[in-house]
């Protein structure tokens, strides 16, 4: 279980012993405007019926994606990050390259008049982030030596990088970010994982309820289970005590306690990063509800988990990838079973077959294309977006800053001067029908291009530790410098290496002029011909219209995600029903969960 992960933070292992001491949790503090008081939530929850999803709103999932420390509770051997091609040349080293990278970051952060609307629905932006959190953790965290990206830096030796970076995820699409019960956890993480299961209906996962905002709530879901379970609820029930929190190792304790006492808004979930912004948090709620709906169909916990994983994996390969990659590349990689990843796996056999190696080129660069898809604000719901009959608009859209504020890390308050809250206010529940189509402005993702929305140049809830350099809040600069420090192959070198395998049709290479157009400063240090991989992935997508990745980006993303599923013995790909590969259509022929829309309908979140 990853308790909290915020950018530029160190890793802490949970080894503290629990010391239970009876104590009453403090009362819920009042909320500021946009939030509300949830009076006596335990009493309301105990009245819920045992059968439907609403029976599990007693909650337990812990996360604080915006805290200054990421704490990890796994004590078994971690997974591995490895280079796809260790010998592929990197960027030219030296001060001229660093200066050009910083100038490149500045150019990417400029707000343009073009709104950048894509034909991609916003849900894919945050489904991508959810996937990333499920399969990788560590490449952008505080690791001595490797995480030094400020000032004059040089590329690290690749052997040192591989030896110094551990993947704190399984490296498979197994939803350990949802269930949080990986083997070998410390005592406190083990207790939290147990609390994530409903105490009475033990096959179900707990969820939380929303607070009364005074403005009403969107009509879906029809039951109260619309939030993650949070620390305040567990404190009020006595499931966790302040004494237990105070007895934790200091680095672990700061994820749950600050100068004002317990962080009551802290979500208790398998990966704290999934509560770093509200859109990912609400998607996490959807997958918890998916598990619980499987239980409603009569499946026990393990079978419900297996079916939830299968549907998730199927959606990644058959909904997410076609939505963001060049479809001819996806078709080619699916038809051949991702041989590029298979060769990578042969070169990097894992010590634990349950933990697949992760390509650094994917994690550090290729899969960060989603940063370009982030909007500065969204048509979130009828209160923070386009109103509907009978509703009162509070704001014309939900700003990026507010979507970070109404999380555990933001303490459910519109600004730091407001009183903190515990639960998500009801008027902040997402209306998913605004996120699954790309029909109107603020109801689509931004195009995948070489510009980032202005809020990504001053990241909220990031780098909050005193003394953290300002650049840690600047996403483009952080990505470019980290890629340089971790000695990523240049994009052109990577294309040459992939093409040399002969596994696929040749990947075309952008000309130096196509790379440097409008950015002549890339020419002198040679970055037009040996280009930072992250920037190149965005640039080639930009040149094909920005509605999907280009050839290299599509290959990196499709080969990795398909390869993880194909090479996981427990995945849907390797499960058979009457001789046929498992699919949602075989599981539920009349109403298959074969799209994100179908999943949201099945979970009661979309009409």
State what each model feature region is.
Residues 1-273, 277-278, 299-607:
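Terminal regions of secretory-pathway proteins
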